[in-house]
């Protein structure tokens, strides 16, 4: 079993020194991935292609799937190699292989040749094509748009009959560009933007800002692991988790409602910049698209970038949501993205679309930056290969109820702005207001003889916070499944 791997065209037009370096890196990447599945796979670099050989025919489908997902490969040919003596012998070998395939079809023959021979490529095409036409009565020659193109590569005394042509994903081999840090949330945008930088030749590390609970974190880790395993498993990468509950709580308490979105993003790029500096990473990657949400205006994006000490890359800046979702389906992250939560109470209800620097700086003046520093210092660093083991751990389940019992208290965990606008009213049960960002520090001070039913508008943050509390030993928590109307 043999494959001829063709490099991405942009690689081939580079200078000889750069082309050789890129081809060498791609060869190493292919070897790293394929030999995990088949130790006997041979990967050999040639001037304008890479040769992949394997004796294990049963691994064919797996090898094809792996090659199709390695950045830097434009396409690859599955070929059958045979020695020949003369042009007529090539025809006989070709006839034996394609006779059944050409029955009732139109066809043409295309030959590429290297080495010294008594015939040219065009002469070989005419001779072989004419012979096939004579010996297969139901087949007809058609040089333009045929049903079947018979492709033959001739090199010295060997011929390679191309059985199948497989498309690759193109791009540059991972390692030809510098490392980047992707801010991954588990949604459609961040997954696709991560993939786009991988395809462009960067090793992508992942940074996740956790707003509470294991369920969301596990979902995001699964997405990052999926992207890494499918498209960049040739390289080791890191997954960094930063607990941002305290930061969000500080913003909700001290920052003007309209400025919260921009301030939160500025805090995220500040934290990510510190992580990037630690690992000598030059750029951070976000999934923002111009105008997609209110915070993603040019004015706001410029102010967000001012808080970063690293280059901020936005590969999706001109993409429509439809395009992004279509790409997520192609790379296999759409199902995970659909299950990711939208947090209630995190982003302001009336965000500014044209933030003013002076106003942002004034609001940040109220912020205790020691909380941000503490979040970064306590970040968790994980080799992404460990995620597969970690996600197999049992996730604690939380009961959701719609009818309240006698010993139960409603715990409204929405932000103060939301509770003021739409208070939870219960004529039969006590209601305690405790914003979600205070639960970790204040829940333990409540009467633990009571059962607490957590409530938020969409039911997402309440579930995540209930999971967090259960993980920390509190068994007296449930989630209220009934929305306020």
Swiss-Prot record:
**What are the disulphide bonds in this sequence?**
344-456
Where, subcellularly, is it found? Cytoplasm
Enzyme group, top EC level?
transferase
Q: Where is the THUMP domain?
A: 61-165
Molecular functions (GO terms): ATP binding; CCA tRNA nucleotidyltransferase activity; tRNA binding; tRNA-uracil-4 sulfurtransferase activity
Name the domain of life this protein comes from: Bacteria
Positions with a binding annotation for ATP: 183-184, 265, 287, 296
Question: Biological process (GO) annotations?
Answer: thiamine biosynthetic process; thiamine diphosphate biosynthetic process; thiazole biosynthetic process; tRNA 4-thiouridine biosynthesis
Q: What is its main location?
A: cytoplasm
Active-site residues? 456
Which pathway does it serve?
Cofactor biosynthesis; thiamine diphosphate biosynthesis
CC per GO annotation: cytosol
Assigned keywords, A-Z = ATP-binding, Cytoplasm, Disulfide bond, Nucleotide-binding, Redox-active center, RNA-binding, Thiamine biosynthesis, Transferase, tRNA-binding
Q: Rhodanese domain: from which residue to which, for each copy?
A: 404-483
Give the enzyme's EC designation. Answer: 2.8.1.4
This enzyme catalyses:
[ThiI sulfur-carrier protein]-S-sulfanyl-L-cysteine + a uridine in tRNA + 2 reduced [2Fe-2S]-[ferredoxin] + ATP + H(+) = [ThiI sulfur-carrier protein]-L-cysteine + a 4-thiouridine in tRNA + 2 oxidized [2Fe-2S]-[ferredoxin] + AMP + diphosphate; [ThiS sulfur-carrier protein]-C-terminal Gly-Gly-AMP + S-sulfanyl-L-cysteinyl-[cysteine desulfurase] + AH2 = [ThiS sulfur-carrier protein]-C-terminal-Gly-aminoethanethioate + L-cysteinyl-[cysteine desulfurase] + A + AMP + 2 H(+)
Q: Return the similarity comment.
A: Belongs to the ThiI family.
Function recorded in the entry: Catalyzes the ATP-dependent transfer of a sulfur to tRNA to produce 4-thiouridine in position 8 of tRNAs, which functions as a near-UV photosensor. Also catalyzes the transfer of sulfur to the sulfur carrier protein ThiS, forming ThiS-thiocarboxylate. This is a step in the synthesis of thiazole, in the thiamine biosynthesis pathway. The sulfur is donated as persulfide by IscS.
Record-given protein name:
tRNA sulfurtransferase
Source organism of the structure: Haemophilus influenzae (strain 86-028NP)
């Amino acid at each position: 079993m043999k494959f001829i791997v063709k490099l991405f065209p942009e690689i081939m037009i580079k200078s000889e020194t750069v082309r050789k370096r890129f081809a060498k890196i791609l060869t190493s990447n292919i070897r790293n991935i394929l030999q995990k599945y088949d130790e006997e796979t041979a990967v050999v670099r040639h001037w304008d292609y890479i040769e992949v050989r394997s004796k294990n025919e049963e691994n064919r489908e797996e090898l094809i799937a792996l090659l199709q997902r390695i950045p830097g490969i434009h396409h690859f040919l599955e070929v059958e190699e045979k020695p020949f003596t003369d042009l007529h012998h090539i025809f006989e070998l070709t006839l034996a292989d394609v006779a059944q395939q050409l029955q009732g079809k139109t066809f043409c023959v295309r030959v590429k040749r290297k080495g010294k021979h008594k015939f040219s490529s065009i002469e070989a095409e005419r001779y072989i094509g004419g012979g096939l036409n004579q010996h297969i009565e139901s087949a007809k020659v058609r040089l333009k748009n045929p049903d079947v193109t018979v492709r033959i590569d001739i090199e010295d005394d060997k011929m390679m009959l191309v059985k199948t042509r497989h498309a690759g994903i193109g791009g540059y081999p991972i390692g030809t560009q510098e490392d980047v840090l992707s801010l991954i949330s588990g949604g459609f945008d961040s997954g696709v933007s991560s993939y786009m930088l991988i395809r462009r030749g960067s090793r992508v590390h992942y940074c996740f800002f956790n707003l509470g609970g294991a369920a969301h974190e596990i979902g995001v880790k699964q997405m990052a692991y999926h992207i890494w395993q499918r498209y960049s498993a040739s390289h080791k990468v890191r997954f960094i988790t930063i607990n941002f509950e305290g930061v969000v709580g500080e913003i909700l308490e001290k920052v003007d409602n309209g400025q919260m979105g921009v301030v939160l993003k500025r805090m995220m790029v500040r934290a990510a910049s510190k992580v990037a500096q630690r690992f000598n990473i030059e750029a951070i990657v976000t999934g923002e698209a111009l105008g997609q949400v209110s915070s993603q205006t040019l004015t706001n994006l410029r102010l967000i970038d001012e808080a970063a000490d690293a280059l901020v890359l936005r590969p999706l800046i001109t993409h429509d949501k439809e395009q992004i979702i279509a790409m997520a389906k192609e790379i296999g992250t759409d199902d995970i993205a659909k299950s990711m939560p939208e947090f209630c109470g995190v982003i302001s209800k009336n965000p500014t679309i044209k933030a003013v620097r002076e106003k942002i700086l004034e609001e940040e003046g109220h912020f205790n930056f020691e909380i941000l520093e503490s979040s970064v210092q306590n970040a968790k660093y994980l080799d992404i290969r460990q995620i597969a083991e970690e996600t197999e751990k049992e996730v604690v389940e939380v009961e959701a109820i719609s009818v309240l019992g006698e010993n139960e208290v409603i715990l409204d965990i929405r932000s103060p702005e939301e509770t003021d606008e739409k208070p939870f009213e219960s004529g039969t049960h006590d209601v305690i207001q405790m914003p979600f960002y205070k639960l970790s520090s204040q829940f333990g001070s409540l009467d633990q003889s009571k059962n607490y039913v957590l409530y938020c508008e969409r039911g997402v943050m309440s579930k995540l916070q209930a999971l967090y509390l259960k993980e920390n030993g509190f068994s007296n928590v449930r989630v209220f499944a009934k929305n306020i109307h």
